[in-house]
Amino acid sequence: MQVTEGQLVALQDARFALVAARFNDLIVDRLIDGAADTLRRHGVPEEHLELIRVPGSFELPLAVQRVADAGRADAVIALGAVIRGGTDHHQYVAAECTKGVAQAMMGSGVPVSYGVLTVETVEQAIERAGTKAGNKGAEAALSALEMVDLMRQLEA
């Protein structure tokens, strides 16, 4: 059986858009740093990285869709942090963000990596933004790199 899968290879010609929420910026800025650092370490030049900020995670899908439809990037990385508050509001934001980002990817055909944290506490968010549980922004960047390589293989 032939197996085709993306590799974590240097993609010096690939362009990546990081679409990130400003809300919970203490956390999201660390996700951005992790994603950008990972891309640079894998050979992506600074001029091939674009950061687009939106007010919050609920607004991520529209910006992701526009970037993907415009052909501005070979992959988009969605970054945000949805943290439980005193109501169920976080559940609605997280669900719609997830659905919207997935729809943007499927509608555009451009890989979108999902680096949006959905957590119960600020402490959990901090753990996932570069401490105990790694950096989910960096993990999303690795996924984006692999998907760009895979899409190129599938087009060949």
From Swiss-Prot:
Enzyme nomenclature, EC number: 2.5.1.78
Q: Residues that bind (2S)-2-hydroxy-3-oxobutyl phosphate, according to the entry?
A: G86, T87, R128
What is an example of a Pfam family matching this protein? DMRL_synthase
Q: Its Gene Ontology molecular function terms?
A: 6,7-dimethyl-8-ribityllumazine synthase activity
Q: Which UniProt keywords apply?
A: Riboflavin biosynthesis, Transferase
Q: What positions constitute the catalytic site?
A: H89 (proton donor)
Q: Which GO terms describe its cellular component?
A: cytosol; riboflavin synthase complex
Q: Name one GO biological process term.
A: riboflavin biosynthetic process
Catalytic reaction annotation: (2S)-2-hydroxy-3-oxobutyl phosphate + 5-amino-6-(D-ribitylamino)uracil = 6,7-dimethyl-8-(1-D-ribityl)lumazine + phosphate + 2 H2O + H(+)
The pathway is:
Cofactor biosynthesis; riboflavin biosynthesis; riboflavin from 2-hydroxy-3-oxobutyl phosphate and 5-amino-6-(D-ribitylamino)uracil: step 1/2
* InterPro entries in UniProt: LS, LS/RS, LS/RS_sf
Is the keyword Transferase assigned to this protein? yes
Description of how the protein assembles with itself and partners: Forms an icosahedral capsid composed of 60 subunits, arranged as a dodecamer of pentamers.
Q: What is this protein called?
A: 6,7-dimethyl-8-ribityllumazine synthase
